[in-house]
Amino acid sequence: MLNENDIEQLTLQRLQSLGWEYRYGKDLPVHEGKFARGDLSGVVFVEQLREAVRKLNPQLPESAVDSVVKSATKSDIGDLVVRNQTFYKLLRDGVRVEYTQNGEQKIEMVRLVDFEHWGNNRFVAVNQLEIRSRKGGKRIPDIIGFVNGLPLVVFELKNPLRESADLLQAFNQFETYKDEIAELFVYNQALIISDGIVARLGSLSADFQRFTPWKVVDEKNKSARLYFDDELQSLLNGLMQPEDLLDYIRYFVLFERDSVGKTIKKIAAYHQYYGVNEAVDSTIWATSEKGDRRIGVMWHTQGSGKSISMLFYAGKLLAQPELKNPTIVVVTDRNDLDGQLFQTFSSGKDLIKQTPQQVEDRDQLRQLLAQNEVGGVFFTTIQKFALNEEESRFPILNERNNIIVISDEAHRSQYGFTQKLHNGKFQTGYARHLRDALPNASFIGFTGTPISLEDKDTQDVFGRYVSIYDLQDAVEDGATVPIVYDDARQIRLNKKDHDALFAEIDALLEEEPSTSLRLREKLLGSQERLIELAADFVQHFAKRNEVVDSKAMMVVSSRQICVDLYNQIIALHPEWHSDNINEGAIKIVMTGSASDTPEMQKHIYSKQEKQTLERRFKDPNDPLKVVIVRDMWLTGFDAPCCNTMYLDKPMKGHNLMQAIARVNRVFANKSRENGGLIVDYVGLAKELRAATQQYTNSTGKGQLAEDVQSVFFKMKEQLEFIRTLFATPIEGKTFDVQAALEKDNPNDLLMAIRFAANHILSLDQLSFDGKAHEQHWFNKKETEPRKKAFLKTAGLVKKGYMLCGTLAEVEPYNQEIAFYDAVRAILTKREQKGTGTNERQILLKKLVNQTVYSEGVIDLFDLLEKPQPQISLLSEEFLQTVKNSPTKNLWVSAMERYLASEIKVKSGTNLTLQKDFERRLKEALNQYHNHNLTVVEILDELFKMSQDFQERLALGKKLGLTKEELAFYEALSQNQSAKDLMGDEVLSKLAKEITETLRKSVTIDWQYKEAVRARIRLLVRRALQKYKYPPDKQEEAVTYVIKQAEEIAEDLTGL
């Protein structure tokens, strides 16, 4: 069957087929030759780098080459991502060097790689390269991709057939490597984790949720999109082609500061890479003599990184020689969007290699565009293209043909060309003015939502879709999370309220310019309704936070309602209020004017204060949990930790789609199964259906939001399946869940949870007849282990509960769900080796009931009501206690986990001891799972194994051997005939002599020098002959001894 090495070899073969050289890391000498890296802690093939610098910069004297290599490989301290950013600038832009040649002082930027001609570089894939850890010992990444001797890509691979060897484990290994061999990651540009089928790509600073797949190799060929085929093959073909990798590194890497000022690294997802490259190609054509100035439309769904895609596009565009240093004008239709995009580009100014400029007013716009002759990135709202009072047509500002206009959210305001009569004059839309001002400019539209059906002329204005990445693609890839919709909480008015309000209609008709709008505001903003709304919101949000840490946006119809609702909420929770901008759990974010009332003025903030609120709301640890808005923050605003939106404002179409996308960002409190939640107070189901229809008619795939009721129904089906498992008899007895739930004594409840877990384990010991799976709701094969089916279904129930747990209909199930989760905790404990993901820690913080608690995992030793240190796992008393336990199956799992951990930890560097007991454990468990051993027999075997292991550990003391001597004694004792012939005393003397001989003979990194290894083999062979080790087994013994010596190399050299 497949193992991890098979996946490694397959990956290396594929890399070679793409043009990479291959070298086996353990064959590469550390100190000499083309693959020398200084010492065992080195990570750069210095001579390869030196050779590349000479080749790519032939004009340099040798002293300058040395200086460049030294600058590129200089060790430093400090934040790893900051160090990585420093190196990235050297890699992309070159190393600045000063030197004297023929008496002339010269300054040059020296290339480390040739981005233009990939064939001038050397691409080498190296596996099993040993790197010294800062904690001692060594770390061995599976595969490292070197370009000109620089380690730019690292792979960590796992076995697809081992359930415990998952991508999370690979990610956690990277986290360990970053700590112990940090120098390797100073140069890194891509991290890849895979089990040979599933594959994910991430940046140096990405958390696990941000590692994403690479689903297509050709964006133009949509049929090439993969679902559950070979993601690793797709990633290798899409990213690791040498030419593509250099293009990716050069144009699709971005460094930013997060909300708390920490440097983070972002790299493009595949849809950004292909979409931007297609857009750049289309731009070059559109601006050519044959082009029509229509670049196209990029539709990348909200939350999938559209703003960063625009930045990547601008960065690559500015570097294209065909465009002769173009000017980029970014146009939005709202000030807040303009500011948000400007901030994104300002943070990424290293990528565009210039400082963007935000246009302040109409006069500055005209001046900048008219005077600009080359380059520049300008941000403006389209309203600044308005006519002056005396103008009938907008004047031409610049006739250059290398001006690119990026239109964010390409909808009607961006291409309003028709005239309308206003105050006796014909007026044209702003888009007409924009094109009059820049008659030879080319246009591209970026949108996160599809263009509405009524806007038939979109492609006539911007051109075809150059890239589509719709909602279904984004959710499947993990770029966004799904949205769940709850419309069961509408707050309606009673008849008395209606009568009183409609009595005011006559007055409104005389006083208000927009009667329907003002009437709607009065209806939604009536005091009695807001009192009810505030009460419901507070109750719902509190319940939501009991399930998962949450932040929320409340969207209302007017600024006055913002203030009135705020007052109602703080009347219920006065501790949420604070006048200090840096304190308080709830704030209002809205525009203001000088004529606002004093009550409203308290909630009007300066630009700097709004930035403070943005930072606070984006910080998951900040106490600001709720913001109330009317229009602000509903488009372009990105706060990934916001997972709930309350809608109390009638919306439709484009605006509705933009708003609800605020909760679809990837974050630890959301997942593919547990997405963002939309709570509807005004009845927008019809509008949501219409928006979905608009979405799918625009060739997009995916559902905008799933009904929370459908989640509830799915959860009930899942609960029913779990009940069938407990209703399946074991030795004639079923498990009575209802009786367990009625227990109010904690000890009794704990006992019931233990019995339930034992019942699930026992199901897999039955001879299978299929009956237990007749109601298996997710239609897996009937031979699927019942424990696995329970764990999966209980996990889905938990995630479903997070979304629909606030429904009144769910309350009767609260205790039952908590009970199943407690059972799940016991069963999964042995599989949680080390730290789990954040998702595991937060998915179910506290269920809404007072009887069953599911915080943490239950320790089996606690079930014996004894402190763990007082229990001897080797005592007969303990063995009998377990044998008499009604949960023997549970103890098998506990003992398996205990022994596996003991063997791994206490064997240390003793290879023979570790392999012997790992083999025994595996064989025993196979016997048990194949029903060749009963539960009592396997317990006997595991306890006997534990005793034998302790005796082997104590053997060194008995024989008077050190740790290293014992390791060699074990290696020599693998030959039973030698042990029988020579006896313990002679073998012990031989082990001591070999240890002493090696101590005197080995040097640092001896295992990498073939001449030294040959001499060591000779010395070992002489010692074996001296003590008359059986001749027919000597070569085998030499091999064992050398392997053991390599394992304890640093102990032998005294490092």
UniProtKB/Swiss-Prot annotation:
- Which of the seven top EC classes does this enzyme belong to? hydrolase
Other notes on this protein?
Type I restriction and modification enzymes are complex, multifunctional systems which require ATP, S-adenosyl methionine and magnesium as cofactors and, in addition to their endonucleolytic and methylase activities, are potent DNA-dependent ATPases.
Entry annotated with the keyword Hydrolase: yes
Q: What is its EC number?
A: 3.1.21.3
Q: How does it assemble?
A: The type I restriction/modification system is composed of three polypeptides R, M and S; the restriction enzyme has stoichiometry R(2)M(2)S(1) while the methyltransferase is M(2)S(1).
Q: Name one GO biological process term.
A: DNA restriction-modification system
Its biological purpose is as follows: The restriction (R) subunit of a type I restriction enzyme that recognizes 5'-RAACN(5)TAG-3' and cleaves a random distance away. Subunit R is required for both nuclease and ATPase activities, but not for modification. After locating a non-methylated recognition site, the enzyme complex serves as a molecular motor that translocates DNA in an ATP-dependent manner until a collision occurs that triggers cleavage.
Show the InterPro entries listed in the entry.
Helicase_ATP-bd, HsdR_RecA-like_helicase_dom_2, P-loop_NTPase, Restrct_endonuc_type1_HsdR_N, Restrct_endonuc_typeI_HsdR, SWI2_SNF2, T1RH-like_C, Type-I_R_enzyme_R_subunit
Listed as disulfide-bonded, the cysteine pairs are none
**What keywords is this UniProt entry annotated with?**
ATP-binding, DNA-binding, Endonuclease, Hydrolase, Nuclease, Nucleotide-binding, Restriction system
Which domain of life, per UniProt? Bacteria
**What would be an example GO MF term here?**
ATP binding
Q: What is the lineage of its organism?
A: Bacteria, Pseudomonadati, Pseudomonadota, Gammaproteobacteria, Pasteurellales
Listed Pfam families: HSDR_N, SWI2_SNF2, T1R_D3-like, T1RH-like_C
Q: Which segments constitute the Helicase ATP-binding domain?
A: 287-468
Catalyzed reactions per annotation: Endonucleolytic cleavage of DNA to give random double-stranded fragments with terminal 5'-phosphates, ATP is simultaneously hydrolyzed
What is the protein name given in its UniProt record?
A: Type I restriction enzyme HindI endonuclease subunit
Q: Which organism is it from?
A: Haemophilus influenzae (strain ATCC 51907 / DSM 11121 / KW20 / Rd)
Cross-referenced NCBIfam families? hsdR
Q: Does the keyword Electron transport apply?
A: no
As for family, the record states:
Belongs to the HsdR family.
